[in-house]
Structures are given as C-alpha cells and as structure tokens.
C-alpha cells in the first residue's frame, strides 16, 4: 500500500528540507541534457517513473523524451541539436498522480565546445582575498573530491598562499593577500591525492573593497575525461 501522495513532494522526502537538495541539472552538452537526484530519496516507490522532456523553442513539435525509474538517480536525454534552446521539463508520477514538476531552459553547446571551463566561477575579489566558486553535481560521486586554490605573487613567486575545501562546500577563499597586487591564482581538483583538473588565472587584488573578479590574462588545462562529470554550469530548479 502506498501512502497518500496527494500532498506536496516534501512529504515523501522528509529527510531533505528542499527539492534543491535532491535534484541537480547536469550541464548541457552539444546533444544531451540530464538530471540527477538522490536515488534513495524515494523509499518504497523506486520503480515509479520520472519523465524528462525537451521542447526546442524553434521547433515545438520536435519534442525529445526520456524515462528513468526514481531508484536510478539519473536520466539523460540524448539526440538534441547543437547550439539550440530547449525548454526542459521533468515530471514524476506515483500511482498515476503527478507529484513533481521541474522545469528549466537550456541552450545546448556548439560542436567542439569545451564545457569543463564552465564549472568554476572566479570571484569575488577583495583587497586581501581571492575566491573561486563552483557548481554542485552528483554529491554521491563527488564527496571525496578536494578543491585547492593557490595564490602566488606574480612579482615574487616565493610568496604563496593556499587553501583547500571539500567539493561539497562550493567555494574556497585565499585570504591574507596584499592589496593592489597581481597574483597567479590556480584552482586544482584532487581525488585520493591525484590531480584531475587545474585552471589558472592572473588576478589583481583591489586597492580596497570587493567586487566580482576581473581576469587580466587567462590560461588553463584540464582532463575532461576524468573529472567525473563535474560539468554543471547551473543548478536551477523552477517548481511548478
């Protein structure tokens, strides 16, 4: 016997205060869009179905649909067109009743685009600190990842500060820097001591105050095939 699912979905996932803690959109590629969720959040109804539908804004009749059981924790919709805008909707049904609707608008990437550069967001920068933020995805797979941010003074490479944080924290900040000074800032991702990704920016701290980062020059490298799918450019759930 299933419980009464006519109430809002929060009743079926009492361990979580918000749907934002359960579902996360995967970054669009040139031909796919995906959604992940905590697969243990639906006890007793793991075999019920979640539907993911993508409607291109330029061709509303050319709809793509994919299905997955709630217990699987993931659904991916393939066969999309590159460089196209889609309205994507996820619906979950239990015993014929719709208990969840999530929607978002995505633009697929053009062919050949390197999406790994969209994971991390530099800033804000103050007169004494540099921060880098990153988007969350697949908590069950990324809990062991460590992100390290290093700031090296460009004029004196021997002067360096570094801070680390677990991936789930979403940001790391290096403090104690000199004001109005150019630093070589490097963000690195590690798992079990092995480096999987690094990206470098030349960033000048402010004379005073704080603002979003101004990148002076850019360089970076990454191993996209070993980043465990950490390619989320946004986690946005619009509940209807």
UniProtKB/Swiss-Prot annotation:
The keyword Transmembrane helix does not apply. Keywords: Repeat. Residues 1-109, 110-210 form the Fibronectin type-III domain. InterPro entries: FN3_dom, FN3_sf. The keyword Repeat applies. It comes from the Eukaryota. This is 45 kDa antigen. It comes from Taenia ovis.
